[in-house]
């Protein structure tokens, strides 16, 4: 989000919502799961959620609502606020926790407008993907009709969504257009959230795990599926970064001890030990751990314990799946 300039992208996405006036918004699941390490996918879900909650608010990017009154003002948008009616997410993870959280569709069903199966529509669209898999895509383009038909085993199957928000009547697993009627609905501002107060001396898991927890609270989507404990998939032999947010809101200097418990084969690179904290200060700390190169099918659990003055402040557990290949941690 920092690299993409979040504010600028949010403005553009809200402009697009006001321009096209969608009844339903469908986007990536904003969360951190095994199988969900794609930072750009998660960022898209964050921006779409913000657009759902803000495009109907006339106080958000009001310049988009200004219309031309002079000859030289032709670049003004003259748009109107627009409140979408439903928000759905689709996960990239195959975890069972997503079952029953929204409608399910068979991708071998026929797309009426296109007169081809849904999987085939996805297959054809994928050919225009420009940033990845170019060699693979060139191979797809060379397939004859028989070879394309054989791709159903790879592209067909079941597709499902997770209902994030609905401002109209309907069921959780009903069709995405269930309850939708043409026309505007009133803007529904997300209720304000009272975050928990930090203890005078506290430690919490930061990074994407901490962000998505707060993001879901802020946008009232805390009921979305989430892992039983923080989790991630990394490449065997890679480094695991555990971000910690440390807070000393007392008037005295404090020492916090970070201890790491891990399975055999893992090694601590940095971040464990004693950390001095100045009075009324906040620190952003990282524990770096090297994963073993040996193959293992079982998930590994890493445990970080923070203590001070003889008391445990926090015990943070992360479930790690080691793979042959993996995306960079972000």
Which ranges hold each PLM region?
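Active-site beta-strand->loop->alpha-helix modules in alpha/beta enzyme cores, enriched
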Residues: 1-65
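Short, surface-exposed loop/turn segments at beta-strand-coil junctions that are enriched for proline
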Residues: 276-278, 290-296
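Asparagine-centered strand-capping/turn motif at beta-strand->loop junctions
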Residues: 245-250, 291-292
